[in-house]
């Protein structure tokens, strides 16, 4: 039981790992002893974050845009160039867009869906061979998709594509879990509530006090909340769990979900 929550020595990739939720997870993985690759579109930021995280362990920068099929394939090939296996894939890279229904841009809708949904599909597909090489009955490989509580309930803001994309991520997680179980690859999702991140920064600045007051646990999520959930889903402790969506939201989804 001593290694139940250990991911030491595992090889992980976290997309969108240079900021926000992805950075919380990547930092947790590095500090827990996993060799962690991070990707993001901005190479200079990705490189700088990897260098900072490497002070606590091993973190490698692989800049990429997984919002296109070619970008996802290129990232998978870059991982394969350096590794013979991949134990953990965290599909976190994502985008949002808010606009009134009558004015919602078609290209914005496509951008959000391409990155948030198709990006997960393509990257997981291209990395399945490496995930399968790491997998066994006793130690399945892991895919962790980052959804949102906005995919579980109707958001108050007019983020039509974002909430639709996250609902799609949750169901894609279940479909992939069913299809990949035979290769001993387990697939689960995390649905974050409010966390301090660049994507949420303006919302928290404007509505933070109200968000804390109305949250059943009375606060906004901390990095350790996200890192701990991801480490659980990446460790032996979750080896018999697949196809689930775990809200990490302080109880918001119990009230509205």
Description of each model-found segment:
Residues 2-4, 153, 231, 242-257:
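Short C-terminal tail/terminal secondary-structure segment
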Residues 11, 18-19:
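Conserved glycine-rich cofactor-binding loop
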Residues 129, 178-179, 239:
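Alpha-helical segment proximal to the catalytic Tyr-Lys
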Residues 181, 186, 241-243:
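Short, small/polar-rich loop/turn modules that mediate ligand/substrate recognition or access, typified
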């Amino acid at each position: 039981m001593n290694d139940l929550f250990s991911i030491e020595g595992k090889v992980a990739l976290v997309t969108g790992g240079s900021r926000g939720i992805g950075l919380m997870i990547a930092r947790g993985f590095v500090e827990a002893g996993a060799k962690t690759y991070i990707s993001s579109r901005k190479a200079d930021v990705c490189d700088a974050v990897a260098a900072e995280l490497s002070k606590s362990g091993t973190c490698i920068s692989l800049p990429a845009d997984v919002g296109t099929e070619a970008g996802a394939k290129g990232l998978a090939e870059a991982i394969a160039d350096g590794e013979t296996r991949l134990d953990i894939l965290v599909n976190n890279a994502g985008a949002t867009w808010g606009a009134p229904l009558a004015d919602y841009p078609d290209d914005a809708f496509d951008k959000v869906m391409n990155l948030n949904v198709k990006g997960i599909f393509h990257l997981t597909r291209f990395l399945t061979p490496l995930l399968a090489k790491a997998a066994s009955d006793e130690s399945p490989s892991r895919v962790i998709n980052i959804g949102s509580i906005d995919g579980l309930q109707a958001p108050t803001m007019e983020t039509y594509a974002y909430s639709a994309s996250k609902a799609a991520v949750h169901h894609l997680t279940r479909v992939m879990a069913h299809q990949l179980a035979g290769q001993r690859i387990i697939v689960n999702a995390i649905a974050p509530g409010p966390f301090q991140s660049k994507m949420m920064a303006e919302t928290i600045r404007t509505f933070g006090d109200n968000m804390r007051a109305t949250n059943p646990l009375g606060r906004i999520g901390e990095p350790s909340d996200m890192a701990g959930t991801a480490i659980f889903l990446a460790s032996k402790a979750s080896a018999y769990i697949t196809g689930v969506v775990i809200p990490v939201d302080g109880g918001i989804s119990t009230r509205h979900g």
